[in-house]
Regions:
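Alpha-helical transmembrane segments
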Residues: 13-17
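Bacterial signal peptide processing site
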Residues: 24-27
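Bacterial N-terminal signal peptides that target proteins for export
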Residues: 2-11
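Mature extracytoplasmic or organellar-lumen-exposed domains after removal of signal/transit peptides
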Residues: 30-177
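C-terminal motif of bacterial Sec signal peptides marking the signal peptidase cleavage site
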Residues: 19-22
């Protein structure tokens, strides 16, 4: 029994200095300014290589979608419906990618509910689309139309466009638009 106590005491005597010496204030961690510079570099890389290109692709695809939808309005053909559906899928893809980092203007100006509100207010959208006076005002004045501000989130954006050009996941028949 004495041998066990002696061995235990000896091990503790050897371990204690090791434990005490390993607890140093100098752990070679970078200082605040080094960490700040590293964080800034990481953020800049993410913004420049992910955020900006994704938002640019979203903007470009959305402009293409708007153009194709304008073509569809002027020349309602099945080919133009199909083109609009293809452009909608492309633009929607970039929106979905961008939701990972709603950053900058997307968060500052609360863009999400304007273009991605759910659920779609289907019955109200049907009423709106059948209101000839409102549609005429929107045609004439565009986004600056007084009636535009009364639409509300559930009648705007991707889901509203989807409702107009798709049915059951397929391009809608042009005769139904």
């Amino acid at each position: 029994m004495n041998a066990k106590k002696l061995l235990k005491g000896s091990l503790m005597a050897l371990m204690l200095p090791t434990i005490l010496l390993s607890c140093s204030d100098n752990n070679n961690e970078p200082n605040e300014s080094e960490m700040s510079a590293a964080k800034k570099a990481i953020i800049a890389q993410c913004v420049n290589n992910v955020v900006v290109p994704t938002y640019k692709s979203l903007a470009d695809a959305s402009m293409d979608l708007a153009s194709v939808c304008a073509d569809l309005k002027e020349n309602p053909t099945q080919e133009n419906v199909n083109k609009a559906c293809k452009k909608w899928v492309e633009a929607r893809k970039y929106w979905e990618l961008s939701e990972a980092f709603l950053f900058g203007a997307a968060s500052d100006y609360n863009i999400d509910p304007h273009i991605d509100s759910w659920p779609l207010q289907k019955s109200k959208l049907d009423q709106t689309l059948s209101n000839a006076d409102l549609i005429s005002e929107l045609d004439t004045d565009g986004a600056g139309a007084d009636g535009f501000s009364t639409l509300g989130y559930g009648l705007l954006g991707f889901h509203a466009v989807e409702y107009v050009i798709f049915r059951d996941g397929q391009p809608r028949n042009v005769s139904e638009i």
